[in-house]
């Protein structure tokens, strides 16, 4: 490999100014993401605020309904991935390799591992809102459409998808909103001795 052939290198072998700028910008962005990780409620409040600003913008401009519909479907897709287990139980159940010994008890605690973790869900949802907001600044994305039909399509899609997801949750007995293994309290200490 000759000098200057690697990505971002200038003719003299040092990283170019543009590469260093975007590299530093990426580091700052990642640093902000890392700092925001423990503040779940604050992150979601900011995202809901952005969503509210976006909805007001669409309402005032009276357009960009296709962009809003696409954003709604994208958020629905993210939500379904958030509710789904990482390993589909129907795939684990269908393996017919012949008779096998039981390896688990039915009541054994298994933590719910999501297909899409909460932080990635929040990050993707927020980026989706920002991209949709940017699209509202360009007239090319303002496709004329009768918006009540889009609302009806979205409600139907939401109901059908959630019905299927809830049936899947009931069939394979998993709840995506558990907070760990159930803990039982023992009997209170009734045999206390009193000092006289």
Swiss-Prot record:
Regions that span the bilayer: 41-61, 63-83, 140-160
Record keyword Glycosyltransferase present: no
Record flagged with keyword Membrane: yes
Modified residues (Phosphoserine): 2, 6, 10, 95
One Gene Ontology CC term in the entry: plasma membrane
Residue(s) carrying N-acetylserine: 2
GO molecular function: acetylcholine receptor binding
Membrane topology label: Multi-pass membrane protein
Domain of life: Eukaryota
Gene Ontology biological process terms from the UniProt entry: neuromuscular junction development; positive regulation of protein localization to plasma membrane; protein retention in ER lumen; retrograde vesicle-mediated transport, Golgi to endoplasmic reticulum; skeletal muscle acetylcholine-gated channel clustering
A Pfam cross-reference name: Rer1
Subcellular location(s) per record: Golgi apparatus membrane
Keywords assigned: Acetylation, Golgi apparatus, Membrane, Phosphoprotein, Transmembrane, Transmembrane helix
Family: Belongs to the RER1 family.
Protein name per UniProt: Protein RER1
Organism: Rattus norvegicus (Rat)
